[in-house]
Amino acid sequence: MATREKQKALARKVARELEVGTASLKKLKTSARKARVVANLVRGQLLSDAYVNLAFQKRAASEPLRALLKSAAANATERGFDADNLIIEEIQVHKGEIARRFMPRAQGRATPIRKQSTHIDVRLSTRDSK
């Protein structure tokens, strides 16, 4: 392995050791725009407050996001961090694949339907580290 690549690999390893808890959700069947509205509500909040806020949201993306936060919290507690001090440091919502379908219309025509998906990444930190 070249020296520069070795340094990059070592830097990634050190960064992984310093992480508190991460989780990612791939191919959520909703558009990124709709999921970002819910993600913006909980960004930067304490984890327990985020659970409460998501429990009372009527949007469809709130339940998968709540499960994702639960997974990230479980990853953090597995690494030995206290779940009461966890904060949502970063939450990113990316566009996923778009499945293209067609709906038949009048006079032999067809109109396209775009079924969008979303990828969500969450990184937690402790309240003390901020």
Describe these PLM feature segments:
Residues A2-T30, R36-L41, Q45-K130:
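Structured, basic alpha/beta domains of bacterial-type, RNA-associated proteins
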